[in-house]
Amino acid sequence: GPLHGIPMTIKESYAIEDQKTTWGNEAFRENTAASDGLAVRRFREAGAHFMGKTNVPLDLADFQSFNSIYGTTNNPWNLERIPGGSSGGSAAALAAGFTGLEAGSDIGGSIRNPAHFCGVYGHKPTHGIIPQTGHELISNVPDSDLSVCGPLARSAEDLKLALDVMAGPAEREAMGWKLQLPKPNFKSLKELKVAVWSTDEVAPVSNEIEERVTQVGETLAKLGAEVSFDSRPNFDPTFAHTNYQLLLQS
């Protein structure tokens, strides 16, 4: 398969046969998976081998990676800093060179946040294209309305490879739909329109981050892309954030 012989790790929240799946929750300390979850099966069928599982915060609900079962995962670039969360163990393992491929999950940044903190690649796919079956504490529960599963890696090419392995309907859905992801339809940066949103009063970032994002936009403009520093999506960020919080807690 496309991952023949590749060793990898995976977020603790995925089910691997005969291994603990606790989500960092003491109530599930002895929760042992009876079988591989769907994502794990697909990786195995593609040829991958699992070395182990990576750390998470309690119930996958934080932007750090500590729980009372496994302890704390720190950022391999600076052990006094956090790796992000909730896929913090995934990103830390990649950044440390311990693994070359990972899978995490994301609602409000749980793949993207640790990928950013640790300097690796992460992708939050469109909801539904990767089944959540097997990313669960209790089997056969309905999929979350907000959460998605997705890959982390050390390059964009590896993200695509992992996404191709993970994506597609589960068996119970396969009669109803199939996945046909389009290929990228541009050949050069000159064909791209880029909007740069470097900070916002609803979610301000540090000056260092704002400056670096602006530099990226300026570089893309020099390379021929059509770049706007003023364009914004047609919605109110404050309302969107409030609506998200209501959905998250519902």
Protein language model annotation of sequence segments:
Residues 58-60, 110-111, 204, 237:
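Generic structural signal for helix capping and beta-alpha/helix-loop junctions
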Residues 75-87, 127-137, 250:
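Short, basic, helix/turn surface patches
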Residues 64, 70, 91-191, 195-197:
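Fold-level recognition of mixed alpha/beta catalytic cores in primary-metabolism enzymes, strongest
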